[in-house]
């Protein structure tokens, strides 16, 4: 081979590595090669995929992006089919709460969202009180009131179309060709032959009407409230349909109402309106969204069989807004127009099941987002919970497909056992909030209304932040306590953020910066102040984690993170020294060798989580950041638990 050829090859390899360094390091692939050889005429040439996602909205794209981040990037790994030829141009979902913003932070997309979104800092309620004429402000609060402190914006207005655009670009950078627009899945069936590795068969129709067939190992229905996947699998929606009619509209508002740029509710004898400040339009005008109760104006035009409502025009909605906001004036800003409007009735339903098994008992078809839960937009959780479904599911699919999971059936079934209760909680909270805030006139509210409202807002705050969601004990969660009762951490919940200083270079980071969704388990080792006593039991326990725990599992699947208190024991004089003042040599050598850039100092973490600096702890985080188990430094229970979920060597 000529020298020039070597140089060209070397340049190509260097260029490839240059681009790959900008991407998340994929999980290693331990799966046995799969083959698809069936003798049936025509079937052998059918396209096959590891995962097919039907629906390219926020839930479907989030799942595709996470799978790509975690290693499913090769052609034929994932196909996402979306009927629309482009991202949503206007309307539909518009609010992102702090857990979703944290997810974007972990994906490296937070700044992209803020660039096109609008942070909502405050919330208000206006009402027409007894004995008064016209509305007046009755509450005024920060949007993050009652919420667990977060390092990200608590509420951001950002159109669904922008979210889809951002996710689509991210997906293209990892796995180009994954998203197929202008096509839709029209039929799904499970292959009855038990020997096939691709048991799910889908029919895909393109824009011209041509139908092709594809097979996959797993199918995810992210195709919305009218899900074809759900219907083909015979999964029903259970719930109720309200006869209340609502209008929703986006436009640049011109008004003397003082709180138009705050999120709020307005109640008067003439109607009820929820207003939500939006981002700027393409023309630079600040948009506002209004949800308007049209019940009195249009109550007779309801088709109770289909959730479709009778004729409703933008002018009908605008007239109701104008009357409700009296004595303030509100109109479309001159020279602008309505950006989007729609009408809906509230259907609060949840799917009877989130998964369907194949004929060997392995979950093969899974539902996410509106395909498995529907509700009103009043607490702004549709897009947020849908994306959280995908966040829960992605790493589980990746672990099965990449041969990491030791029990594929149990890990996939945990998706339904964990997310079904969340979907039901969403429907129940939405119903309670609507009943309290929208279905009762101001004059008819009970004396304890304010106390009831505060309690419900605390529940909603915990739900939207994610800290109020608690997964029950199960295959992936061990709630038994192996640590003293003072520790505030709970298995099945999220870990609150905290600030740390990296021991190697002094860089200040947030613990959540280490909890990225790369598909790896995070082993947090709170190593005590006695780690510097290398012959002591605590240093021996930490050394054993590196020598006897991590090496028995598939390499590259568990990331150790060492957290030290501000003071460590001084073996020379029996006192203590500032951790930042000592050298690596005082700690077991395995730490610098295996976790040099994952060793941190944070007294705040010990204090905030109520972990003793004298006893330490081991906290195992799942790839989605949820606490699986909390153990003492000997990590006996952690080792036993990991053997049930991750393959050993």
UniProtKB/Swiss-Prot annotation:
What's the domain of life for this entry? Eukaryota
- The signal peptide, as residue positions, is none
Q: What's an example Gene Ontology biological process for this entry?
A: biosynthetic process
First-level EC class: oxidoreductase
Null mutant phenotype? Impairs the production of usterphenyllins and uscandidusins and leads to the accumulation of the terphenyllin intermediate.
Between which residues do disulfide bridges form? none
Q: Which Pfam families match?
A: FAD_binding_3
**Needed cofactors:** FAD
Q: Which Gene Ontology terms cover its molecular function? A: FAD binding; oxidoreductase activity, acting on paired donors, with incorporation or reduction of molecular oxygen, NAD(P)H as one donor, and incorporation of one atom of oxygen
Which InterPro entries does the annotation name?
A: FAD-bd, FAD/NAD-bd_sf, PHOX_C_sf, RIFMO-like, Thioredoxin-like_sf
Kindly state which keywords UniProt assigns to this record, in alphabetical order. Answer: FAD, Flavoprotein, NADP, Oxidoreductase
Q: Which family does it belong to?
A: Belongs to the PheA/TfdB FAD monooxygenase family.
Subunit info?
A: Homodimer.
List the EC numbers from the record.
Answer: 1.14.-.-
Q: What is the lineage of its organism?
A: Eukaryota, Fungi, Dikarya, Ascomycota, Pezizomycotina
Q: What is this protein called?
A: Flavin-dependent oxygenase ucdD
Organism the protein comes from: Aspergillus ustus
Spell out the Gene3D superfamilies in the cross-references: 3.40.30.20, D-Amino Acid Oxidase, subunit A, domain 2, FAD/NAD(P)-binding domain
The function of this protein is: Nonribosomal peptide synthetase that mediates the biosynthesis of usterphenyllins and uscandidusins, p-terphenyl derivatives. The pathway begin with the biosynthesis of 4-hydroxyphenylpyruvate (HPPA) from L-tyrosine, possibly by the aminotransferase ucdG. The nonribosomal peptide synthetase ucdA then condenses two HPPA units to produce atromentin.
Pathway connected to this protein: Secondary metabolite biosynthesis
- UniProt binding sites for FAD: 92, 185, 344, 370, 386
